[in-house]
Amino acid sequence: MKKLVLLFALVLLAFQVQADSIQNTDEETKTEEQQGEEDQAVSVSFGDPQGSGLQDAALGWGRRCPRCPPCPRCSWCPRCPTCPRCNCNPK
């Protein structure tokens, strides 16, 4: 029984030493990040509220946009400036 208690105490001591070394490493990392940290602006955009041409194209092949007239050269593509599939649009 004494051996079991001694073994358990050694295991707990080993875990505590390991936890202390991990905590010290985390503190060193935070200190390094703060020293090298600069004011940086980050901009994240998930698209405009109206959607994009790729999203519109993904919704349906050959689907005409109700706000755009059909192309005079080909009847299957809309004449939208945002349509990525229309080869007739001047770019």
From Swiss-Prot:
Example of a GO cellular component annotation carried by this entry: extracellular space
Primary localisation category: secreted
InterPro entries assigned: Alpha-defensin, Alpha-defensin_N
Keyword Signal recorded: yes
Keyword check for Disulfide bond: no
GO terms of biological process kind: defense response to bacterium
Gene Ontology MF, one: identical protein binding
Endpoints of the signal sequence: 1-19
Propeptide boundaries: 20-65
Subcellular location: Secreted
Region (Disordered): 22-55
Record's keyword terms, sorted: Antimicrobial, Defensin, Repeat, Secreted, Signal
Tissues expressing this chain: Paneth cells of the small bowel.
Residue windows of the Sequence repeats: 65-67, 68-70, 71-73, 77-79, 80-82, 83-85
Pfam families: Defensin_propep (PF00879)
6 X 3 AA tandem repeats of C-P-X: region residues: 65-85
Family, similarity comment: Belongs to the alpha-defensin family.
Free-text function comment from the UniProt entry: Apparent precursor of a secreted, cationic, proline- and cysteine-rich peptide that contains Cys-Pro-Xaa repeats. Unlike cryptdin, the proposed mature peptide region lacks the structural motif characteristic of defensins. It may have microbicidal activities.
Name of the protein: Alpha-defensin 31
Organism: Mus musculus
Gene designation: Defa31
